[in-house]
A protein has these predicted regions:
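Nucleotide/phosphate-binding catalytic cleft detector across ATP-hydrolyzing
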Residues: 1-10, 16-129, 140-145
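Active-site-adjacent helix-turn-beta-strand microarchitecture at beta-sheet edges
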Residues: 135-136
Length: 145
């Protein structure tokens, strides 16, 4: 099966397409669009222009996924939508325009998923993981993995 994962970040919106079978997965495509959503924040709120940029990118990713015959698309937002005053309105507007539901991750979930994604491929038993995004930084110290 194939699945599209979208990371709706403060500066970039990234699409990754994976082929997976059970616990095994393989990256087929990684596309990044410089959207600069952080630049559309005015008085703590994402402007209509910023929402429109997000909608355009998500719509183009949805079309790309249909070319790959991928029907499953999961969209996650981090600080880009978490740290604005109109999170609910932005998520609703994106859904209304694109039909895409955006899940806004809290800081703890973002850090846990970043950690899981970072240690899965390499199996490093002890370390410090730094996830540096456009609008947030998560640090995770771990040992005996």
């Amino acid at each position: 099966m194939m699945c599209g994962i979208v990371d709706l970040g403060s500066n970039t919106i990234r699409l990754s397409i994976y082929q997976y079978e059970g616990e095994h997965f393989r990256l087929l495509l990684n596309k990044k669009t410089m959207a600069g959503l952080a630049g559309y924040v005015q008085d703590g709120a994402l402007s209509d222009g910023g929402i429109l940029v997000a909608c355009r990118v998500l719509s183009s990713y949805r079309a790309l996924l249909s070319n790959f015959s991928v029907s499953e698309m999961h969209v996650f937002a981090t600080a880009s939508l978490r740290n604005i005053s109109n999170t609910g309105e932005a998520v609703e507007a994106i859904r209304d325009v694109t039909g895409v539901t955006v899940e806004v991750l809290d800081v703890e979930t973002e850090a846990a998923l970043s950690f899981k994604g970072a240690v899965l491929p390499g199996g490093v038993p002890t370390g410090l993981l730094a996830d540096i995004g456009g609008g947030s930084v998560e640090l995770v110290s771990y040992r005996d993995m």
